[in-house]
Amino acid sequence: VKWNRLKYACCCSLMVSIPVFGQTLEQAVTLTLQNNPDIKSAFNEFTSKRYVNDASTGAYLPSIDLDAGIGYEGLDPSDEVARGDTDYTRKEASVTLTQLIWDGSATLNDIDRTAADAESVRFQLLADASDKALEVAKVYLDAVKAYEVLKLSEDNLAVHKDIYSDISKRVTSGIGSTADLTQVEARIAKAHGNLAAAQNNLYDTHTMFTRLVGQSPQGLIFPRADENFLPYTVDEAVSTAYELHPVIQVALADVDSAKFQYKQSKGVYYPTISIEASQTWRDDADGLKGRSDETLAMLRLRYNLFNGGSDVANADSFAYQLNKAKDLRESAYRNVEEGLKLSWTALDLTLQQKEFLSDHVDSASETVIAYEKQYKIGQRTLLDVLNTQNELFEARKDYLDAKYAEQFAKYRVMNATGQLLSALRVEVPQEWLDKVEY
């Protein structure tokens, strides 16, 4: 048996060589936020809402209209009028300027409502980006772990082949059992199966990475979460989430939008006051031969006295929409708190599990070394050594699961507190961060 190789595999139970590549998790997240169609779609929605807000502000700017026309005009005067019938080619043009002065603050509230809508979509964009970053972290960790498991599986198969070679020599020389050889052959078949599964899992994780990030992995490095962004207590974490989580900010902006919508609906209870100025030019119009001009400058008041009760019904409808938005805000607080506590518990239990699994790896490694020494003095068989080697292989896989679960749990907590993008040092476009004022 190649005992030096066996010792290396046993004593270095947690040392797995990972190739040095340049693509960090932070780079993968940045690339995803730049190219992922879901994020681009969310940004387009935000940009659209910004233009809706710009459009609503136009209602408080002057409106200038040009009206022009040419056509036939025939006039048949009454009998009392001395002149006869007239047939003219009527020509006219007018320019009208209208400036809104006051409309019960309906336009002002509409401007604020559309701004609140845009702000809500902006925070939703940040929430989507944070969730997408967490998704990238998951597939990134899975891909790195898959490579480590593949290396474990390769080393495990190599150890099985070494032991098989030694037992085969012993059987050939007549001092070994063919039953032992058959049993090792079965173990080798299983080791081959583990290797094939590891290869398939590595391929799957790379495929998912490519779909999400937009390019194939250029090489992945085990990431370490910045623990400065992990609160010390769950209560501190909840307070941070209430302040920073974009989902809560979405709910708050939605309440503001509903509030402005309700106020806007009550603007119809008041008159609309505007200034209108116009200049009109006519030629051969109204039965008069020749040109005539008309200039107007008016302060107008329009007041709807009755509208079949529709305005009252609309106001009542928007009042209930406001109550609905407040209920959704409360639901957002509860959902964020629930998600945070689940993430916190997952991290706490994963840390505990990792400690136990680390002890398991250490004990299994020491057992293999002890069995090796006992084999040399005839107290153990190679099958005994192989059994402990299999236990060590499974222990190392379990530890890897816990190791990567711990990192992902940390990222989950950061996402649940609304700090994941900051923790990853991801620079999002400035327009994602600029508040829409209202």
Language model: regions and residue ranges:
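Bacterial N-terminal signal peptides that target proteins for export
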Residues: 1-10
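Periplasmic alpha-helical coiled-coil/stalk elements that build and connect Gram-negative outer-membrane
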Residues: 8, 131-242, 343-346, 350, ...
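Bacterial Sec-pathway N-terminal export signals of envelope proteins
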Residues: 21-69, 101, 177, 216-256, ...
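Small/polar (Gly/Ser/Thr/Ala-rich) solvent-exposed segments
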Residues: 40, 63-88, 98-127, 249, ...
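Amphipathic alpha-helical coiled-coil segments
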Residues: 41-56, 128, 132-152, 162, ...
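Acidic, low-complexity, intrinsically disordered peripheral segments
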Residues: 74, 398-438
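Transmembrane beta-barrel architecture of outer-membrane proteins
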Residues: 90-92, 138, 183, 236, ...
